[in-house]
Amino acid sequence: GVRLVGSEMCIRDRVTHCPHCLHTIGKEYAKFDDGQFETIHHTELLADLLKQEKLKPTKQVNEELTYHDPCYLGRHHGEYDAPRTVLESIPGIKIKEMEKNKDKALCCGMGGGNMWYEVHEGKDIVENRLEHVGETKVEKLATSCSFCMINFNSGKGKVKKTEELQIEDVASILSKSIE
């Protein structure tokens, strides 16, 4: 947030949409600003606003979905609860967890540029993760990383059970329930 100190504006916190940026700005760049700015992911901000009742999801959103934990939000930042808190606050949302979730979740394959790696034998990383999604038999995959969304959208045709899968950001799903 921004606060006024005397007649000057001071930036106190930073919010990122991208978990990769969260890592870079919050951990790498923090070395240069002595860690004086807190950097949080947008799902952490949304979860906090929901807890403070500054956001109130009221519209019914009848969807069954599964949630994919992005590597940089989960394993690198330790945040697994905020996206689920946001989704669970939405009336009508039913979350069907994949067997491998939270700290056991597999990468979507976008991290480290694996999306562009040509696999000659076996399956792409995204195919492995999409098979886990397919096992849940849901029509929607929620995530909170735009890189994951891009990779899942480009890979969903490779796995029969996920050809028609809808992929959507947690904040976008929440917005359907806010009046």
Located regions from the model:
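Single conserved hydrophobic/aromatic residue that forms the stacking wall/gate
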Residues: 1-11
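Helix-enriched interaction subdomains in cytosolic or periplasmic regions
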Residues: 12-45
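Local cysteine-cluster metal-coordination motifs and their immediate loop/turn environment
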Residues: 15-24, 68-77, 102-117, 139-154
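Short, flexible loop segments at boundaries between secondary-structure elements
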Residues: 35-59, 100-103, 160-179
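Catalytic cores of enzyme domains
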Residues: 45, 55-77
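Active-site glycine- and acidic-residue-rich loops that bind
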Residues: 72-89
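Long, compositionally biased charged/polar accessory segments in the mid-to-C-terminal portions
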Residues: 93-99, 117-126
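A short, acidic, amphipathic alpha-helical segment used as a generic capping/interface helix at domain edges
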Residues: 121-139
